[in-house]
Amino acid sequence: MAAADEPKPKKLKVEAPQALSENVLFGMGNPLLDISAVVDKDFLDKYSLKPNDQILAEDKHKELFDELVKKFKVEYHAGGSTQNSMKVAQWLIQEPHKAATFFGCIGIDKFGEILKRKAADAHVDAHYYEQNEQPTGTCAACITGGNRSLVANLAAANCYKKEKHLDLERNWVLVEKARVYYIAGFFLTVSPESVLKVARYAAENNRVFTLNLSAPFISQFFKEALMDVMPYVDILFGNETEAATFAREQGFETKDIKEIAKKAQALPKVNSKRQRTVIFTQGRDDTIVAAENDVTAFPVLDQNQEEIIDTNGAGDAFVGGFLSQLVSDKPLTECIRAGHYAASVIIRRTGCTFPEKPDFH
């Protein structure tokens, strides 16, 4: 008799998926206002920018932001890698509102107000640490063809303080409510102690902590902070360029992305109840996934190259899509499918923006 009864719970699960609670997904990072424009090669050369890169602004980039606004047709979008991912995840989750939480630091200014408004519009539960020493951070997205060169002027984003925000009980309770955590590697340049506090909490409570390699410079110049948090990472994201730099910095002695994924998966881990999963996207090429004992290649959705408007935010969107299914304990293949879907939507639009409702089934 029991055998006949077995499928019932499964069926029930499909008809009535467990309702998600608010704040089930937690993200923390650098909230930035993206200033994006299609530029020319001369502009990239003038500021010695690579066509497809992410860097932090230096003194030589001081004029870049003004020149971008004066010389090209710019668009303003609420950005910042982790914040983008939270918005995309919330968009795919739809209900409840505020399933995704976001922490970061902004200035008390016009750009800060825009970020607050945009987060509210996206139904993300954003709790910003607001300070008046630095203005809200900006990120110049210099687009040429299918490439985007990002120059981030962190400003206020760099002022996030663990003891002034994360440690406050009213904020920490939101961390405790989450089941899945996501922090872009970028935030390791700002507050590694905040990243570690959240990572440790996740490991101690057997919840899922996820991290992104974010940019080649993180693996190069913030290696210590990155490797301090790596033992807590249950799911590691990155793209092919970041994977290659990470492998070189770690002495993996291979350029094969599947091998790199395997070696990253095998790095020491604190919570032995969860084996690490490593996911490397490669633009239009297959997404490489090291999970359990296999490395699998997942093809991305066929995309008409003419339809691609702006690849900025594609990686963030992939993560957001992935996390939107992970919070409901969907299988890995579904998480990847949602990631690919989200990225395919975002690259057809400027900035990390999306239509009102998703079309993902």
Swiss-Prot record:
Record: residues binding adenosine: D34, Q305
Recorded GO MF terms: adenosine kinase activity; ATP binding; deoxyadenosine kinase activity; metal ion binding
Cofactor: Mg(2+)
Placement of sequence motif Nuclear localization signal: 7-15
Modification sites for Phosphotyrosine: Y76
Sorted UniProt keywords: ATP-binding, Cytoplasm, Kinase, Magnesium, Metal-binding, Nucleotide-binding, Nucleus, Phosphoprotein, Purine salvage, Transferase
GO biological process: AMP salvage; dAMP salvage; dATP biosynthetic process; GMP salvage; purine ribonucleoside salvage
Regulation: Activity is inhibited by 5-iodotubercidin and 5'-amino-5'-deoxyadenosine.
Reactions catalysed, as given in the entry: adenosine + ATP = AMP + ADP + H(+)
Pathway: Purine metabolism; AMP biosynthesis via salvage pathway; AMP from adenosine: step 1/1
Residues at which Mg(2+) 1 binds: S48
Textual note on the cofactor: Binds 3 Mg(2+) ions per subunit.
SUPFAM superfamilies reported in the protein's UniProt record: Ribokinase-like (SSF53613)
Residues where Mg(2+) 2 binds: N147
Classification via InterPro entries: Adenokinase, Carboh/pur_kinase_PfkB_CS, PfkB_dom, Ribokinase-like
Top-level taxon of origin: Eukaryota
Tissue: Widely expressed. Highly expressed in liver, testis, kidney and spleen (at protein level). In brain, expression in most forebrain structures and the cerebellum is higher than in the midbrain and brainstem (at protein level).
Pfam families: PfkB (PF00294)
Cellular-component GO terms for this entry: cytosol; nucleoplasm; nucleus; plasma membrane
Location of the active site: D316
Function: Catalyzes the phosphorylation of the purine nucleoside adenosine at the 5' position in an ATP-dependent manner. Serves as a potential regulator of concentrations of extracellular adenosine and intracellular adenine nucleotides.
Protein family per UniProt: Belongs to the carbohydrate kinase PfkB family.
Assembly behavior: Monomer.
Listed name of the protein: Adenosine kinase
Protein's organism: Mus musculus
Higher taxonomy: Eukaryota, Metazoa, Chordata, Craniata, Vertebrata
